[in-house]
Amino acid sequence: MGVLTDVQVALVKSSFEEFNANIPKNTHRFFTLVLEIAPGAKDLFSFLKGSSEVPQNNPDLQAHAGKVFKLTYEAAIQLQVNGAVASDATLKSLGSVHVSKGVVDAHFPVVKEAILKTIKEVVGDKWSEELNTAWTIAYDELAIIIKKEMKDAA
């Protein structure tokens, strides 16, 4: 179980705010990275099916990527406050949806890599090993809960 320090949570918060400052650009970049890392993942997303490239200014894409980053940010807060990420109705639902869409454990490292690369690009020279560690711990702890909910939903 990962616990985040006040400094790490502050780093996640400030970088999350920077990410949110340009949702169209940053969500597009996130999905571009996902498909560069795992081209086969394209068919998991309705808003990417039948498209030769990641669409610009797609509200569904922006909402999906925004939710991934928001849930990871919220996981960081929970780790600071409670020392753990707690499951809730949203994560239970996500587990079920992920199962129905064909998401498997191997997809989680792809998303993590794309998150980290996106945040690194967003913050530029403010990127640090501590920021990397904070986002990694938050995402890993969130992924553990989502995978558990996927197993329960299967």
From Swiss-Prot:
GO BP terms: nodulation
GO MF, one annotated term: oxygen binding
Localization annotation: Cytoplasm, Cytosol; Nucleus
Binding site for heme b: S46, K67, H98, K101
Assembly description: Monomer.
Keyword field: Cytoplasm, Heme, Iron, Metal-binding, Nitration, Nitrogen fixation, Nodulation, Nucleus, Oxygen transport, Phosphoprotein, Transport
Keyword Nuclease: no
Tissue expression from the record: Accumulates in developing root nodules and present in roots, especially in the upper part. Detected in leaves at low levels.
Classification via PROSITE patterns: GLOBIN, PLANT_GLOBIN
Pfam families: Globin
Main location: cytoplasm
Record keyword Hydrolase present: no
PANTHER family according to UniProt: LEGHEMOGLOBIN-RELATED, NON-SYMBIOTIC HEMOGLOBIN 2
Any one of the GO CC terms: nucleus
Protein name in UniProt: Leghemoglobin-1
Residues in Globin domain copies: 3-151
Nitrated tyrosine found at: Y139
Residues carrying Phosphoserine: S46
PTM entry text: Nitrated in effective nodules and particularly in hypoxic conditions; this mechanism may play a protective role in the symbiosis by buffering toxic peroxynitrite NO(2)(-). Nitration level decrease during nodule senescence.
Positions that bind O2: H64
InterPro entries listed in its UniProt record: Globin (IPR000971), Globin-like_sf (IPR009050), Globin/Proto (IPR012292), Leghaemoglobin-like (IPR001032), Leghaemoglobin_Fe_BS (IPR019824)
Family: Belongs to the plant globin family.
